[in-house]
């Protein structure tokens, strides 16, 4: 379109001067003018894209802390599965899937305890969104040696801000964190903080990555073992972003029929 300049001597000048900001002036061939709201976003600001500087990285130029390559062994046969070095590797993410009741929480809590028992300097944490204190009391009857494991019960913070609670807790710096489960933690934060599912997942995954990188008070490279729920079809419940940041995937299953004594 052409630019039309309206001077003071124009018969429409006073009418135009009285229009509110961001009104669209429609000019017709016969000279008629009307005013309307900006339905098409004609006043929307355009942003200029700055030239992007791309920096390529050579693996030889990367510098890593030696602590990243020191495993956290459990002293069990499971160490051979977790890494070639034997044990949980710092800054990694292990996803644990399995049918309900197969014993995911029990097995992983035992491994969590064994990491700390093998090296008391390693701080371990259990984040429970599935069970409350009463549920864990029953576990304690069977596994009294779990008595000193630090546990964050999200059910204790239903009237608080679970998002801030998780951030504050993880910021203390933990070597190994067991989360039960990924879906329940996300759902708790989503409901209590009025976030969308995608924003909640992005927040939690970004938080995990930051902890992997040692962005906490102790500057330790946190390893996460995250329990996943399975759908009826046997696939895990979660976003593809979770798949992409996974270091390793483990599955616990029944050996033989469901509820059999043996698992693998």
Each language-model region and where it sits:
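Conserved P-loop
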Residues: 93-160
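Interdomain "pre-motor" coupling segment immediately N-terminal to P-loop NTPase/helicase cores
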Residues: 25, 39-49
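Phosphate-binding/switch loop-helix module in NTP-utilizing enzymes
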Residues: 156-216, 220
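Acidic, low-complexity, intrinsically disordered interaction modules
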Residues: 6, 13-18
């Amino acid at each position: 379109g052409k630019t039309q300049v309206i001077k003071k001597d124009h018969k429409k000048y006073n009418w135009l001067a009285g229009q509110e900001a961001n009104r669209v002036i429609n000019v017709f061939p016969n000279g008629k003018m009307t005013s309307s709201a900006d339905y098409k976003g004609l006043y929307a600001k355009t942003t200029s894209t700055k030239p992007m500087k791309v920096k390529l990285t050579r693996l030889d130029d990367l510098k890593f802390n030696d602590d990243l390559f020191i495993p956290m062994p459990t002293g069990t046969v499971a160490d051979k599965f977790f890494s070639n070095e034997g044990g949980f590797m710092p800054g990694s993410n292990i996803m644990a899937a399995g049918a309900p009741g197969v014993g995911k929480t029990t097995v992983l809590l035992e491994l969590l305890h064994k990491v700390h028992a093998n090296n008391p300097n390693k701080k371990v944490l259990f984040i429970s969104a599935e069970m409350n204190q009463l549920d864990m009391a029953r576990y304690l009857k069977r596994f009294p040696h779990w008595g000193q494991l630090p546990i964050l019960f999200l059910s204790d913070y239903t009237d608080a801000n679970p998002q801030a609670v998780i951030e504050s807790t993880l910021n203390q710096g933990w070597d190994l964190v067991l989360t039960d489960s990924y879906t329940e933690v996300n759902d708790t934060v989503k409901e209590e903080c009025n976030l969308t599912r995608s924003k909640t997942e992005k927040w939690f995954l970004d938080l995990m990555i930051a902890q992997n990188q040692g962005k906490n008070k102790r500057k330790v490279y946190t390893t996460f073992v995250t329990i996943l729920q399975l759908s009826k079809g046997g696939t895990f419940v979660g976003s593809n972003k979770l798949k992409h940041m996974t270091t390793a995937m483990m599955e616990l299953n029944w050996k033989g029929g469901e509820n059999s004594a043996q698992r693998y």
